[in-house]
Amino acid sequence: MTTVADILKYVETLAPTYMKMDWDNVGLLCGSRETPVTKVLVALDPFERVCREAAEWGAELIVTHHPMIFDPLKSVTEETTVGRSIMTLCRHGISAVNAHTNLDCAPGGVNDVLAATLGLKDVETIPPFFRDDQGRQWGLLRRGRVEEQPLSQFLETVKSSLNAEGLRYVDGGKPVRVVAVGGGHCSDELMSALDAGCDTFVTADIKYNEFWDAQALGMNLIDAGHFATENPVVAVLAEKIAAAFPGIQVKISETHRDCMKFY
């Protein structure tokens, strides 16, 4: 019999908890470790629609990238989306597990999958590196190479590969050869990408001043969207869980889509 604890332990082999940022919240955030599991729903976010989908499908567990609980909670009521999500899970005996920044950093995680989806070659982790008191070292960003091409061509690749609704970008005035990637909000690592010899950086949630900084520094900076840059890992995560636990059903959420549209 497979339990929540079994799947949690496996997820933590894929994305060790020591790789999470200090401010993050990962692991089992709702439910019971002892609950038997026959169905797992995998999604990027544990939003209300995903929780309802899990309940309707009869899942005992949802596994997501983003955490069910991130900001401190003072109450759990139906007056908030987080409260409704938690209450839906509790009513139906569904547990919630997530791997967030630990999955961003982990080998084969968010940023390795993003690099592979964009067709980058010779992919490697670049600084900044993190190290714990046991001497273990890891990093967040990835760097890879593409055949030299104009920015316009690479933009087409990014948009089509990630099924992005649209892209925001600045042209740094250079062809694309060496690309850094950071799924989700990694734009504060612009200088890290530049110092690593990258001419192009693909990330999300880029601020106004960061676009100006990139242009001044001669960096092609591409905002492909938070959902689009991180969602590719969902299919990979679901596939790995299904392979590790062949006796259970694993499904990718059919209701969770990017809510952002471009007019």
Describe every region a protein language model picked out.
Residues 1-263:
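Hydrophobic structural segments
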